Swiss-Prot record:
DNA-binding region(s) in UniProt: 278-311
Species annotation: Heliobacterium modesticaldum (strain ATCC 51547 / Ice1)
Keyword DNA-binding: yes
PANTHER family, alphabetized: CELL DIVISION PROTEIN WHIA-RELATED
Name this polypeptide is given: Probable cell division protein WhiA
Free-text function comment from the UniProt entry: Involved in cell division and chromosome segregation.
Pfam families documented for this protein: HTH_WhiA, LAGLIDADG_WhiA, WhiA_N
Family indicated by similarity: Belongs to the WhiA family.
SUPFAM superfamilies: Homing endonucleases (SSF55608)
Family annotation (NCBIfam families): DNA_bind_WhiA (TIGR00647)
Gene3D superfamilies per the UniProt record, alphabetical: Homing endonucleases
Annotated transmembrane regions: none
């Protein structure tokens, strides 16, 4: 089971206690996955389809809690691809004189289709959380924290995408909206904001799993950076030591250590004797000991001698 599916399974088990939150979440689910249908028996009805059995059960419970009716769940089997089940739930447009569509913000007071949920439905913060939870259940997904950080909610309604983005902004999340093949994607890319989103919609187990993986991933990346840095530094040290050794052998063969000042002769002999030693270690072997900069200065003088000899073809004086 993917991380996204696990997150949705957790959300499907959440049952809001307050009727206002139940209505807000149900409205989001129907707006994401619902459609209006007209039949001879029921007349106008609102139908929602989902491939998740747990989401279907949640919708069933929410309808019963909000409107006091029990609906039937029709199970259909896909004939193509994975051949998974599709759960279809229908809700009459009117129940006991109540306008269900208007209560959920699907239609306005004049009976026309409403492109935006009414402000009354989202005036409380708890209801805004519930609405976002329903929207994520209906059309959301989140990548495993092992990979690229990404959470998105997909809708075919540009206005609804804007509303979802504005809701997220009210919680301090900088959601962005993009369009892909006629669909509108509201998405988050930053790990901290994804964690906050999981908290907002109540996916606390998913949040903990996400954080655990993110911490381990961060530590692993930090260790890799340190190892790469140490490796790079070691490579530089080895390359420098090899270059210095070759240069000193050139000086030894062409000039001779006997012609060098004692300070240069001492550091040259130590470098040949200890080719893997660092500048600090070489400095501690000198008598008297000197620091890294002092050793580096002497090696540079040797390098200058070698370059001068190579250019002039003779032995330069080193006072």
């Amino acid at each position: 089971m993917s991380f996204s599916v696990e997150t949705k399974e957790e959300l499907a088990r959440i049952q809001p206690r307050r009727r206002c939150c139940q209505l807000a979440e149900l409205a989001a689910l129907f707006r994401m996955d619902g459609s209006l249908q007209i039949s001879g028996e029921q007349g106008l009805s609102l139908t929602v389809s989902t491939e998740s059995a747990s989401s279907a059960r949640k919708i069933f419970r929410l309808i019963k809690a909000v409107f006091g009716v029990q609906t039937q769940i029709l199970v259909r089997r896909k004939r193509r691809l994975k051949k998974s089940n599709v759960y279809v739930i229908s809700l009459p447009a009117r129940i006991g004189g109540r306008d269900v569509l208007q209560e959920m913000g699907i239609t306005d007071s004049q009976g026309g289709f409403s492109f935006e949920p009414p402000s009354e439905l989202l005036k409380r913060q708890c209801c805004r959380r519930a609405y976002l939870r329903g929207a994520f259940l209906g059309g959301g997904s989140v990548n495993s924290p092992e990979g690229t950080y990404h959470l998105e909610i997909i809708t075919n309604d540009e206005t609804h995408a804007r509303i979802l983005s504005e809701l997220l902004h009210r919680f301090g999340l900088t959601a962005k909206v993009s369009q892909r093949k006629g669909w509108f994607i509201v998405y988050l890319k930053e790990s901290e904001q994804i964690v906050e989103m999981l908290s907002i919609i109540g996916a606390h187990s998913a949040l903990l799993n996400f954080e655990n993986v993110r911490i381990v991933k961060g530590m692993r990346n930090q260790v890799n950076r340190l190892v790469n840095c140490e490796t790079a530094n070691l490579n530089k040290t080895v390359d420098a030591a090899l270059r210095q050794t070759e240069m000193i052998r050139f000086v030894q063969n062409r000039i001779g250590f006997a012609n060098l000042p004692s300070q240069l002769r001492e550091v040259a002999e130590l470098r040949l004797q200890y080719p893997d030693a660092s500048l600090k270690e070489l400095g501690q072997m000198l008598n008297p000991p000197v620091g890294k900069s002092g050793v580096n200065h002497r090696l540079r003088r040797l390098e200058s001698l070698a370059e001068a000899f190579s250019r002039q073809g003779g032995v330069p004086r080193e006072d």
